[in-house]
Amino acid sequence: MRKGIWGFALVAIVLLMASCSSESEYANAIPKDAAMVMSFDFKTMAEKSGINGKGGEKVVAKLTDALKSGLEGEAYKTAEKIIQNPSESGLSFTDKVYMFITPHSNAFALLAKVDDEGKVEALLEALKNEQICTELKSESGCTWTQMGTALCAFNKGTFLLMGSNKGDALSLKGSLLSLMRQDAENSYVKTTDFGKLASAKGEVVTVMNMSFIPNDITMQMRMGMPADLKLEDIKYLVSATFEKGKIVVDVETLIENKDLIAMYEKQSAASSCIKGACLEYFPANTLVWAGGN
């Protein structure tokens, strides 16, 4: 388990240290029925955080030291090399990085573009030697391996890391390989939701519908809602922008169901904007506050 965590940690570090790349078709691997899709602009996030400048040198040093306690031998040398030069990972993170969740949260995945297939393979071979992932296998035009409770696959353009809420990684193999060879016509990229995701401003942008909620919770949500309502009809676009000292979050409803729109309008008519009359009673050091009227 601890070995698997270091595999995920290395990917996370590379995300914030990434370098330039060009467009590709890797987003075709997002399933058309994805319940939640998030896009991450790690290039802008890294620029705003200052991690690539002089101020980020201490952070990089701490990340390198942290890896020393979790990786050894060739895996550590590879990780250290990637931190110094992220392109050595073979992955590109100035193209958008995506995370998606399937309906009822049955599976979740991280998707990135591959710049150099050979370097990705070398990275995973180093992790395999540390028993962080299993033997690499070639099948259906890609290479795949198991990393803890997740499966990882890559080819010359796509890197896909996929896990299940049931913890049975191998049960995802069929879906993983199918998504790796999926074309645009059968992908999320051909939906109007993807167009809104791609055009929205923000370092982290999410399009989601309520079908991502597990089955055992959805029954409670349906109370008081139209009988013919589909959870897929309840959709939101959420964008987060990182500014100095704050994170600005914008939420937009993408609901098209007329009955549901009427219900929301009725609820909105019974509420009003918060005037802030009670703010003076909050302590000056309040970390989070919320209110409704």
Locate each region found by the language model:
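Extended, charge-rich low-complexity interaction segments
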Residues: 166-174, 220-238
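A short, solvent-exposed beta-edge/loop patch
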Residues: 144-178
